[in-house]
Amino acid sequence: PEELDEDEFDNPLGEGTGAGVIFGATGGVMEAALRSAYYLVTGNNPDADAFQSVRGLEGWKEASFDLNGTTINVAVASGLGNTRRLVNAIKKGEVHYDFVEIMSCPGGCINGGGQPYKEDAVMVEERRHVLYGLDKRDNLRFSHENPSVKQCYEEYFEKPLSHRAHEILHVK
C-alpha cells in the first residue's frame, strides 16, 4: 500500500469559540451577542462573565445592561408556552426589549429532541454547566474574535454593521 505524508486535518467548519458553545443553553445566544455588542460599542472586551444574569432555566427572564451609557433591555424565553406569553406581552405593549432570545426547548438545545430524554431538571442543569465550563476553558470566548468570522468580514462583509452585512445577515 502507498504511504501518505502526514498532514494536518482540514477544518471544514472553521474554528469555534466559547461563545458558540454556550448557544446550546438558554441565554447563551444572548450572552454571546452581548459580549460582542459590548466590544462593538466600547472597543474593549467585557469580562466574559459580565452578562451571566441571562443564564438559567427560568421560562422568561429579563435583564438590563449599560453599554457605554446606553441601556439595553433584553429578554430570554425558554419553551413555547413562555414564548407565547412573551410575544403576547410585546404585542400588547406591556414590555419593550431591544433584543429577545427564544429557545423552543426548555433549557435550550441541551434539552432538545436530539438529546437523550430525561425528565428531571438535574440533567439539563448538568449539561448547561458543562457548556459554560467549556466556554470558560476556551482560549477564544468572544464571537467577534473567531478567526473564521473575522475572515468573512475582512473578505466579504467589509466590517461588522456594514451595509452589505446588514442586507445579507439581518432579517426584517
Which sequence ranges carry the predicted segments?
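Iron-sulfur (Fe-S) cluster-binding modules
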Residues: 1-172
